[in-house]
């Protein structure tokens, strides 16, 4: 499966991948684009036979997830999607948990009902074309009185066999039993009046994904981001901003210990708050949570850098962190011996003194 995509936003910004709902294109995310591209490089893709993507059949949601991953060169990224796009996003988060820094599931589900109706819709579309669905979809996508013609008009351009194949992929999609495996900070967005993926399906996602939050958008149906763009955009932007902070705080506690982090938070003032937020998101989420190195290796790098720059006031803290990350005292000694060669004997001598005092203070029970 080959997916057409487009990228907007600053070239050096973190990546956010956004997938559409069945029957729509990259344009369904247009109302959110201006706000999200102020902080993110946004990659939007089209489903097979939709927008700029070539027709295709015989694929699964897992195949679509693989195709999306083929578009992503970044080591870490956030991903979101509407309805079918949300199913793809969930599948990506399950396939590469260490790479997904944030997850947005908009008007979607872990399972889209019984297979029968989806297969019937596939047969109808093959016989009569996608445009035949427009009257029914208008009532599912939008609440009464909302003018969503600019979205509905796109149905005329959708390839019928590809649309039918999407229906058949949704018919067998079910990750209900795997929601507990989703590791990324997740936001679930539901339209309060969505008949396609009702609130109980959103609650299943929010309850099943560890730590997930739920936003219910009033006066909105299935395409909540089109019908109530302000509420949806605000929820997504806040989640992506706060999700990095939450993930960073969790990693910081795991590496440095609750006592240290609690002291740092208690000591935060209005003057230092922005800096604390910066290091939590940038150092402890964006760097420490990258999958390229394990935490033992990152501790070795941190110890070496602190010795090289003479930051002895931080070294004791990172000796304790190295023990938490699985290094033994003998391995810490080997790291410091290596620094004597490349950072200088005086620097290593001072580091050994700090490390010895730290290890002596901890005793045999460790950090």
What are these regions (language model features)?
Residues 27-34, 40-80, 234:
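Active-site loop/oxyanion-hole signature of alpha/beta-hydrolase fold enzymes
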Residues 1-17, 37-41, 234-243:
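Alpha/beta-hydrolase fold catalytic core
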Residues 113-116, 127-181, 265:
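Conserved alpha/beta-hydrolase catalytic His-Asp/Glu region
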Residues 182, 188-190, 194:
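Short beta-strand/loop motif that positions the catalytic acidic residue
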Residues 242-296, 324, 348-367:
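Acidic, glycine/proline-rich low-complexity segments that act as flexible tails and inter-domain linkers
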Residues 81, 85, 89:
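Gly/Ala-rich beta-loop-alpha elbow adjacent to hydrolase catalytic centers
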Residues 90-95, 99-134:
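Flexible "cap/lid" loop of the alpha/beta hydrolase fold
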Residues 212-244:
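Catalytic active-site module of serine/aspartate enzymes centered on a nucleophile-bearing elbow/loop
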